[in-house]
Amino acid sequence: MKILGIGNAIVDVLCKVDDEFLIKNSLTKSTMKLIDEAEIKNLLSGLTIQDTISGGSVANSVVGLSQLGNRVGFIGKVNDDNLGQKYEDGLKKEKVNFLYKKNSESTPTGTCLI
């Protein structure tokens, strides 16, 4: 491994929404809002997930470096849940050596709704 990144393992959950959904949920276009687990579950219950992608700024950077032909790794923490497995699979697909400890606590893998 030539390059190692350490960061937050966050699954990007891509969803298509209309203006009505944004208004109903007090969301504003082109902004970021921190929400808790209960609110994310509530939002996801009214959405159709288009795709899930391994994300987080450091992971995105090492994926880019991998695509340029570098041998890379990433250290992050995911939960032992469905999203944690998708995160791991996504990095493996991009040839990133994912060095992690799966957390078995009730806290879910970090998620970003896009």
Summary of predicted features, one role per range:
Residues 80, 84-93:
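Short, electropositive alpha-helical surface patch
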